[in-house]
């Protein structure tokens, strides 16, 4: 396995739970397997996943599919090829990830990937490049990757994963076959986690993480559930005007749970928007404007969307030096002024 990431290998969590196949992506796996056996597998795939739904899992599975040493059963999951892909040690698989410094995939990394894919495969078969998340490609890196997609070396498979494919250039998307990995139902997530790790407080943890079971493949569900409950209570109190924005911002900014709390904040806002939309319209299609909820308080949906965008931006910039307490205080003050009674 090689990694075009400034010499750093991809994290060991790149494909958690390979031993338990997510049932909600069974159709996508069947499509890829049929195409491979018929000799019609495209040279590039774009996996559009709901967050934590298993895009990287499917990308790793696709690498196993083409590198399995038992073609009749590919991917068998037991041969040397499959096990090395799973362990992130296969010499013909290159992972492309965002650098820790910039949280972007840079043009130098894409050039390294192109050079690696141009080499002869160690096993005489496929060379695989996995770009995850592809929506971390900066503009220059995306343009460089487009050249590889337009003229791929023979015997290569490029797999891109993205939760926000709209951030990718349309020309890049057009060179890929798209697969959609939907978010699992709560029951599907619980069943998968139970098969993988045994019984646990999976339902409560999935509620906190927004039904993203792959994020729980190695996490402790009880701690996540407790953090989520505390976050929801805090946000409810802020919306009702019974909590101090300054004190709560200082408390949230301390410790290592801030990324999880911000995810809870994002899920809480998403839920508030859905509950205040008078029809089951997808959240991406909700029109901004006031809506009268059951509590009789006119809420501005535009303001809630604005808060949601800022929470997502704060989550994406946690590695950037800034005063997180002040950023949280500004968000909490807006929430208190807005009000969002249940």
Enumerate the language-model features and the residues they cover.
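Conserved alpha-helical scaffold flanking the Walker A/P-loop in AAA+ ATPase domains
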Residues: 30-36, 106-128, 136, 140-148
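Short loop/turn elements that form and flank the Walker-type P-loop nucleotide-binding site
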Residues: 40-41, 86-91, 122-125, 152-155
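AAA+/P-loop NTPase substrate/partner-engagement loops
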Residues: 75-105, 166
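Flexible beta-alpha connector loops of hexameric P-loop NTPases
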Residues: 99-107, 134, 178
